[in-house]
A protein has these predicted regions:
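AAA+ P-loop NTPase catalytic core and its hallmark functional loops
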Residues: 1-137
Length: 137
């Protein structure tokens, strides 16, 4: 059963599901990033959370998932990326995290200095940052 079918089964508005389908066709994923689109093995149940999150994404808003450990934030993020057919990157923050770790840095490779992109650079390059509508930018 597809994620969209599971949303239907959960009682999510058919209008929202049609808007998700429109979003998917409007923002196709490059072939090189298709392997990063999650295929969740578990489904997040919570129709209110789903409807609010779907509406926010379709309106070009960002989401901040907050809660105690083991409350389903990562599971929901994985499900949401799968529903919208978007690639997913996991970035673990630590005490030594700096801008170069996120954006990228020059590195020495095969006798040449090359740029090694970080996750923020890669996400921006693939269009995953700034999906807000023009009037909101």
């Amino acid at each position: 059963m597809s994620l969209l079918d599971k949303l239907r089964e959960l009682g999510i508005s058919e209008n929202l599901i049609k808007e998700i389908e429109k979003f998917r066709s409007q923002y196709p994923v490059d072939k090189e990033y298709e392997s990063r689109i999650p295929v969740p093995t578990q489904f997040y149940y919570g129709s209110d959370v789903w409807e609010q999150a779907i509406t926010a994404v379709l309106c070009g808003e960002n989401l901040l998932l907050v809660g105690e450990k083991a409350t389903g934030k990562n599971l929901f993020a994985e499900n949401l990326a799968g529903v919208f057919n978007r690639p997913r990157w996991d970035v673990s923050f630590h005490v030594n995290m700096d801008a170069a770790s996120l954006i990228g840095t020059d590195t020495f490779c095969a006798g040449e200095v090359t740029f090694r992109p970080g996750p923020v650079y890669t996400a921006a390059k693939t269009g995953e940052i700034g999906r807000a509508s023009c009037r909101e930018r």
